[in-house]
Amino acid sequence: MKYKDEKYEKAEKGSRILPKTVLLILLCGLSFYLGGLYCGKNIIEVSDVAKAESSSLDVDDSLQVKSVSFSECSSDYQDYTPCTDPRKWKKYGTHRLTFMERHCPPVFDRKQCLVPPPDGYKPPIRWPKSKDECWYRNVPYDWINKQKSNQNWLRKEGEKFIFPGGGTMFPHGVSAYVDLMQDLIPEMKDGTIRTAIDTGCGVASWGGDLLDRGILTVSLAPRDNHEAQVQFALERGIPAILGIISTQRLPFPSNSFDMAHCSRCLIPWTEFGGVYLLEVHRILRPGGFWVLSGPPVNYENRWKGWDTTIEEQRSNYEKLQELLSSMCFKMYAKKDDIAVWQKSPDNLCYNKLSNDPDAYPPKCDDSLEPDSAWYTPLRPCVVVPSPKLKKTDLESTPKWPERLHTTPERISDVPGGNGNVFKHDDSKWKTRAKHYKKLLPAIGSDKIRNVMDMNTAYGGLAAALVNDPLWVMNVVSSYAANTLPVVFDRGLIGTYHDWCEAFSTYPRTYDLLHVDGLFTSESQRCDMKYVMLEMDRILRPSGYAIIRESSYFADSIASVAKELRWSCRKEQTESASANEKLLICQKKLWYSSNASSETN
């Protein structure tokens, strides 16, 4: 009985536990069921909200930005160059003139105001007349006129500066100087030489003369307090950019220019291990030419006028010759004040040098890309052209204008780049340029001379406009795919740049700015406000901007442009894309309201 009683008691306890367990299971099931209904409802509601938000974006799919307003800068900022500001020079060292290099202000020190034109500013004289004269009030600098009056760089006549084509090394005029140069370098006559760089350009008379001979020159000079060389060049309608060979590479890829020129530019070529000449070597195309006039060339007849001794100049010339030979340059021609050296067209010379462990300068190692040129330090070593490139040398490069539409060999270095991509890009920009001209008839007229394509790929717009009376500075982002070598291989010019910073030019230097997806590609890094302020700084009064952007950014850009005193209209692209819009803008000509009060 005891056993049975115990078993009964256990059974009775078990019978009480079972209903509780079943009840617990039922309650859990009910809760899951109800929870599922609730969550399902919630999911449906969230989904509906997402759809509603999506549909609202479809209606107004655009970036919303805070309203901005810009005051006028004071009149002493009329020639403000943020990254080469003479006001800041004393903060930087004088060694190798590093203070003249780019030193951009931090965000908290950036100017958020509109740069005014000089008092009495007028719309620039139109090309080609501008090559010979400009308004004095637009570039009111008398230093060259007073200090170089005997050299005929320029002279002031009434309200204008006149450019007679003189210079330190061409007293008989720049045309006679270039005629002699062409006699020494026949490749200047037949389209072999298309791109050139002029270091220490003066008022860019050399580059201006070459334009008439089918050679496109980048005139280079540093920012200064009194000469304004680059500003004069751009006011004349001649390509130019602020820059100096100091401690950093110039913002150009390797093997780019067909010719480099220095006319008494006073660069100490043999000092500091020859790094300045090594930089010229880097950017010069294999088989390209380096032209030097002035000390120490023709020292035998000129040394007395150089405030030196014949022994010192002979020594300088011998050092220069030795340095050039060590870089695989050969003397090509020499007459009177002009000497021409040619860079080795192949790598045989460099291979011989590498067998000598004591050779100087050494070959650069693989740790530094030859095309790396944005805040990249100069190094005392030779950049040897890549042996895989067989058609980059000057002789193998198609002559101008054939090279403009020939697929460059270096497009294979661009991710996804090939001949088909190049041809498609070329065709695409012909269509786009035709559409632009319908929307902005000023393109092709004398109203537009200096043009910047702010984020080009292969220079397609510049190629499409090549027959118009204008030139294009092609800008490739230092953060984008390296397509700038392709631009140069086509016979066009350009530079690397980061649009989170100011460009290396004076205010009021471009007639037309072209933007293609810049804000889309750089929106994560660069503040739209600062980019557009920079566009306003470098755009001439009454100048134009064509902004090709996603619909998402278009309205915000137009809103900021209004505060810049631009007038903009929205247009369809040539394909009437719903995802992309065109803004055709014009900058207003205005004068500083602070000028009179500041002068009183």
Curated annotation (Swiss-Prot):
SUPFAM superfamilies, A to Z: S-adenosyl-L-methionine-dependent methyltransferases (SSF53335)
S-S pairs: none
Cellular localisation: Endoplasmic reticulum membrane
Annotated glycosylation sites: N594
Keyword field contains 4Fe-4S: no
One protein family per Pfam: Methyltransf_29
Catalytic activity, EC: 2.1.1.-
Stretches in topological domain Lumenal: 38-600
Transmembrane segments: 17-37
Cytoplasmic topology ranges: 1-16
CC per GO annotation: endoplasmic reticulum membrane; endosome; Golgi apparatus; Golgi trans cisterna; trans-Golgi network
One of the GO BP terms on file: methylation
Inducing stimuli: By dehydration stress.
Broad EC category: transferase
Membrane topology per record: Single-pass type II membrane protein
UniProtKB keywords: Endoplasmic reticulum, Glycoprotein, Membrane, Methyltransferase, Signal-anchor, Transferase, Transmembrane, Transmembrane helix
Family, as annotated: Belongs to the methyltransferase superfamily.
Protein name, UniProt field: Probable methyltransferase PMT21
Native source organism of the sequence: Arabidopsis thaliana (Mouse-ear cress)
Origin organism lineage: Eukaryota, Viridiplantae, Streptophyta, Embryophyta, Tracheophyta
